Design a protein with these regions (language model features):
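Low-complexity intrinsically disordered tracts that form flexible linkers/tails across taxa
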Residues: 291-311
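Short, small/polar-rich motifs associated with maturation and membrane association
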Residues: 1-267, 272-288, 296
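Conserved small/polar residues in nucleotide/adenosyl-binding loops
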Residues: 317-321
Length: 321
């Protein structure tokens, strides 16, 4: 029996693009193999402009993620909900994970939460886990979803200095319509003529300050000003990639005496050892917040104050001698 002829087989190269990889609590998996609902937002996909808080970076970018602004106080934390609330009494805030470390998002009313204290210029990516499968990674505290934040790290190239700054101004866009001083006096005279107003009250208003006119809403509101300044230095010193950043944010509220000031600093070192088999990440972050709260009750009170009265009065007393 004759031997079979030899065969020459040539394999042709076939390049394929690898599937997306998603970093989760316990490692990395292919996006196609991950059963949970995950949305990853990179730096180039985030919102641009005068952004002063991390919530503003992803607002409107993630389906099912609801971001409601705070009470208007400068620096107030936003309310974040992933696919609505699940409890009437317990917290509905999602779990915030910063560089692999879970943090509490609880805060007193009107004060910044954990997410609001982060400098948005230090954030590299957001990953939002939106369904109950997140509890398999982080436990029951992730029942309201998870927001994973990865901050920027040192680069492998030359030293790079980055600066960004912004200034903004805002005015109260809506005020309560009220009567002016002359309209108020005319209304009282009409009520007195109809017998629905007491004569003594009408005489006091007409005679004590006959020409006084005060807009109480103008007295409590002001033009809100804000500035945000950030500088970062990144590079590699020998085998040590590093990134150092500083940020300053100052906001003056539209309600007088309301202000917020934030100082942030971050140091990131990411060396590798044993021929890149061992990676070490060292992150040091610090935040200083200074809040001055305005009396929010002044907003409602200004709509009911008498426009015929002055803001300040001076009483002169003569001594008996």
């Amino acid at each position: 029996m004759a031997a079979a002829p030899s065969l020459t087989v040539t394999l042709k190269d076939d390049s394929q693009v690898l599937n997306d990889v998603v970093v989760i609590g316990y490692g990395s998996v292919k996006k196609s193999d991950l059963s949970g609902s995950v949305v990853a937002i990179k730096a180039e996909e985030m919102n641009r402009g005068a952004v002063t808080s991390p919530q503003e970076l992803i607002q409107g970018k993630v389906p099912g993620l609801f971001v409601a602004p705070g009470n208007g106080q400068p620096g107030a934390g936003s309310t974040i909900r992933i696919r609505g609330g699940a409890s009437l009494n317990a917290s509905n805030d999602p779990l915030i994970v910063i560089d692999g470390i879970p943090t509490s998002n609880d805060a007193a009313p009107g004060t910044p939460n954990a997410l609001a204290t982060i400098n948005p210029n230090d954030i590299e990516t957001f990953t939002v886990l939106k369904d109950a499968s997140a509890t398999a990674i982080y436990g029951s505290r992730a029942s309201n979803g998870v927001i994973i934040i990865t901050t920027k790290k040192g680069s492998q190239g030359k030293v790079k200095i980055t600066y960004s700054g912004s200034f903004a101004a805002k005015d109260p866009y809506q005020r309560v319509p009220t009567l002016g001083a002359d309209e108020f006096r005319s209304t009282l005279l009409g009520q007195y003529a109809e017998g629905t107003a007491q004569g003594n009250a009408v005489r006091n208003i007409l005679n004590v300050y006959p020409n006084q006119s005060t807009n109480w809403q103008d007295a409590i509101y002001q033009t809100g000003l804000s500035t945000d300044q950030n500088i970062a230095v990144s590079g590699k010193a020998g085998f040590l990639p590093y990134r150092v950043s500083f940020g300053y944010n100052n906001e003056r509220g539209t309600l007088k005496t309301a202000s917020y000031e934030r100082y942030t600093g971050a140091i990131n070192l990411s060396p590798k050892f044993f021929n890149d088999h061992l990676s070490v990440d060292i992150n040091v972050k610090g935040t200083i917040n200074n809040n001055r709260f305005a009396d929010a009750g002044a907003v409602g009170a200004a709509a009911f104050f008498d426009p015929t009265k002055p803001m300040y009065t001076c009483l002169l007393y003569t001594s008996p001698s």
